[in-house]
């Protein structure tokens, strides 16, 4: 098994994950972010976001998440397009399993996995 060490490992790439990454990176903690199944989170499938400060005319969800990612990278966040499949908090440093076998050791883990839509299967839901 390949082993690496991180100060802060962030699971999830929605608004909470990227905000955590920006703050951790600005603090000099060199965060490592794993995007998960849906890079950018639910906002990547959202059209108009009109209730977020800084966008007086609104913004498309995918554009907003691209900008969050760019800002996190600008401050030094390392971003991986991979899934964290398990976390072991019983040892320190903590261990996160990436995919099937790759283990990353880390001093801190931020879980920002967000939410996912629960579809009911009714006709009006697609409108």
Annotate each predicted stretch with a short phrase:
Residues 24:
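Aromatic pocket-lining residues of Rossmann-like dinucleotide-binding sites
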Residues 40:
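Active-site catalytic microenvironments in core metabolic enzymes, especially phosphate/sugar-handling
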Residues 14:
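Glycine-rich NAD(P) Rossmann-fold beta1-alpha1 loop
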Residues 17:
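N-terminal Rossmann-fold NAD(P) dinucleotide-binding loop
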Residues 44-103:
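N-terminal Rossmann-like dinucleotide/flavin-binding domain of flavoprotein oxidoreductases
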Residues 1-11, 27, 32, 79-127:
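FAD-binding core/adjacent interface of flavoenzyme oxidoreductases
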Residues 33-37:
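Conserved acidic E/D residue at the C-terminus of a beta-strand in Rossmann-like folds
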């Amino acid at each position: 098994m390949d082993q690496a060490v991180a100060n802060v490992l962030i699971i999830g790439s929605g608004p909470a994950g990227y905000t955590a990454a920006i703050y951790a990176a600005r603090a000099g903690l060199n965060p490592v972010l794993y995007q998960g199944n849906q890079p950018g989170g639910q906002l990547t499938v959202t059209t108009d976001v009109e209730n977020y400060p800084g966008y007086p005319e609104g913004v498309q969800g995918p554009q907003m998440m691209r900008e969050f990612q760019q800002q996190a990278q600008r401050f030094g966040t390392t971003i991986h397009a991979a899934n964290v499949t398990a976390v072991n908090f019983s040892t320190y440093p903590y261990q996160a399993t990436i995919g099937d076998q790759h283990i990353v050791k880390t001093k801190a883990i931020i879980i920002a996995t967000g939410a996912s839509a629960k579809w009911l299967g009714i006709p009006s839901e697609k409108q």
